[in-house]
Amino acid sequence: MAAAFDKISVVRVNEIGNRDVTILEHDSIRVMVDDIGGMIPELSSVQDTRRLNAHWLPWFRSNTMKPFNDAEYGSFWKANLLYNIAGNFPCIPNFGPGHIFEGVDMPPHGWTANLTWRFVNSGIDEETKAAWALSVMESPDKTMPLSFKKIDVIIPGHSVHYTSLSVNNQGDTDIDICAGWHNTVGAPFLQPGCRISGSANTWTTPPVGGEFDTTTRLALGAQFDSLDKAPLARGGKIDISQVPGPIGYTDFAAGAVPVSASLGWSALINPVLKMAYVCFFTGPAAAREDDIILRFNDLWMQYGGRPFTPWAPYEGGTDLTYCLGTENSIAAYAYGLEYSRRVKQVLGAPATITIPARSGKTLRYGTLFSPYDTGLDEGVLSVEAEAAALVCSGAKGNGSFKADPSFAMLKGISGRHG
């Protein structure tokens, strides 16, 4: 289905790799949403006569034109997720590695990142003139009877991709889950000198026993108060708020969103291109009973520390992958649902959220990608919500961006079309 109004449109196409996708576009941004895993390989901004894509497109992303088959492709790609991975994607009910939990086969980062979303409909909302696309998914295992409904939205004048993702529990028992958005940026937007920040004011690296044991330069299981004072494994400290080049390490850090925050956020600034990438979501202080509230800023700093496939072209080869995950989640690090249920909390914040029996909750999320003036060159220090704007404060000035930080418009569009 295709729909358009003035200079805003939503169309269905088949992209490279034989993937069915929805493209939402207006004057300032274009968003491509894959059916498979809800991957978002493109969030691009108009730059004069060209476009700049913020999102990561891995060199190893499959273009075989065939679905993943473990017998044929497993030795290189290791998992269906890595066969199709790109950009940003929703991670529910798992955030972390694949595992069997209470008899349920839980794929890496959950069903929402692996299975095919069923496209339902799309169009232009008459009231707001926003473009929207609705997709749904059902749990493949009746032991965990969840259903998912996702509506992707772009609003005229906003350089923001909005998503409302509802999780419904169709069973008679409450279910504790993890949830997250795996925002991943890549070159050419990502480059040395970019500045990372988030709403968290307390950070930690994951404990020993996970995937970063052999890849990280950071001290594991260490807590710190500022990204510019992250502890190194060899001793000393390093500023991880400044993005390096491919240095041969893959690191992870998690920061707790303050319970007093009405708005949660994470940001990446490119001071050379003068582009801001800002994720925002309802904070703990503004939570309602039916909200899925993300509790952590998670940084996956993939700077070349994985000498194995598919990150490297062969086992023991050079990791060719350079990207940054500015992820936001409710989960214990990226260690998975079973681990998150077991530890219950990280930095005093809950690692899971309960979906009540015969009920549901909704995660509302925005990703902004926009030019800015010089005031944000040294990074974003804080983000505040105004009635119709997102205000980012930097060391040398502010940047105000048209947005719907209360998600009032998103809620209205979801109610009319979801």
What residue spans do the PLM features occupy?
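Surface-exposed acidic/polar loop and edge beta-strand patches at domain peripheries
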Residues: 2-162, 173-176, 180-418
